[in-house]
Design a protein with these regions (language model features):
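Outer-membrane beta-barrel proteins
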Residues: 2-11, 15-215
Length: 215
C-alpha cells in the first residue's frame, strides 16, 4: 500500500519534467460544508484543494486534501487512473483512490477501485472497497449523474448514489441537485443535498455553497 501511494506521489512530482507530455492543473475551494456520499465530513466550513497531472496517453495521477472534523482534522487522498473515449459521445474512466488521514489512526484509511462510463451528459459509475473506513468491511457504491447547461452562464446537475456495505451504519442513498456558474474568475456552486437516512451525520435537506478557483 505504501509503495503504491509513493509511486502515485512520485509520478505527480515528476510532472515538471514531463510538461511536454502532460497537463498540470490545480484547484482550491471553500465550502459551507463537506458531504461525502450523504455523510457530513466537516461539520461546517471546509477548505479543500488539489492538483492533477493528465498525460496524453489518457493516464492521470493526482492528490486532493480537505479539512474535516475527525481523524485529526485532515483528509489527504491519492489517486491514479486512465480515461478514454469509445466514440464522440461515449467515454470511460477507471482508477484507484486511496483515502488517507495522516493525523489520525492508519486503521481509518482505506482504498477503492472505481469506474464510470459517460453517455453525453449522463454518467454511471461505481466504487468498490474490500475494507471500508475504519476497517468496517467491504462496500459498494453506485451512482448516476446528469447535468446540462442552462443558457450560456449556468449549469444544472443531478446526482443519485446508493451505498451498500457490510456495516449497515454506512448504508444510505444520497441525492443532490446543484446549480453552478462562474463570476470574476471563480466557480460558484449551490447544492441541495439529502439522504435516505435521518439523524446523525447524514444529510437532511442541506444546502451547501462552494466557491472555487481553478489554477
Amino acid at each position: 500500500m505504501k509503495a503504491l501511494k509513493t509511486a502515485i506521489f512520485a509520478a505527480t512530482m515528476m510532472s515538471g519534467a514531463t510538461a511536454m507530455a502532460a497537463e498540470v492543473s490545480g484547484n482550491v475551494a471553500l465550502s459551507s460544508d463537506y458531504f461525502f456520499r450523504g455523510i457530513d465530513q466537516s461539520g461546517g466550513e471546509a477548505l479543500s484543494g488539489g492538483f492533477d497531472v493528465a498525460f496524453e496517453s489518457g493516464f492521470y495521477v493526482g492528490t486532493w486534501a480537505s479539512s474535516i472534523d475527525f481523524s485529526g482534522g485532515l483528509e489527504l487522498d491519492y489517486y491514479a487512473g486512465y480515461g478514454g473515449s469509445i466514440s464522440d459521445s461515449v467515454s470511460y474512466d477507471v482508477g484507484y483512490l486511496y483515502y488517507g488521514y495522516p493525523q489520525g489512526p492508519t486503521t481509518e484509511e482505506f482504498e477503492e477501485f472505481y469506474g464510470s462510463i459517460s453517455f453525453g451528459d449522463a454518467t454511471v459509475g461505481f466504487a468498490l472497497s474490500d475494507d471500508y473506513y475504519a476497517s468496517t468491511g467491504s462496500s459498494t457504491y453506485v451512482y448516476v449523474d446528469y447535468g446540462f447547461a442552462l443558457g450560456e452562464d449556468y449549469s444544472l446537475g443531478f446526482h443519485y448514489g446508493n451505498m451498500t456495505a457490510d456495516d449497515a451504519a454506512n448504508e444510505a442513498d444520497d441525492y443532490s441537485v446543484s446549480l453552478s456558474t462562474e463570476a470574476a474568475g471563480l466557480g460558484l456552486d449551490l447544492s441541495w443535498i439529502d439522504s435516505s437516512e435521518n439523524g446523525g451525520l447524514f444529510a437532511d435537506n442541506q444546502f451547501v455553497l462552494t466557491i472555487s478557483k481553478s489554477l
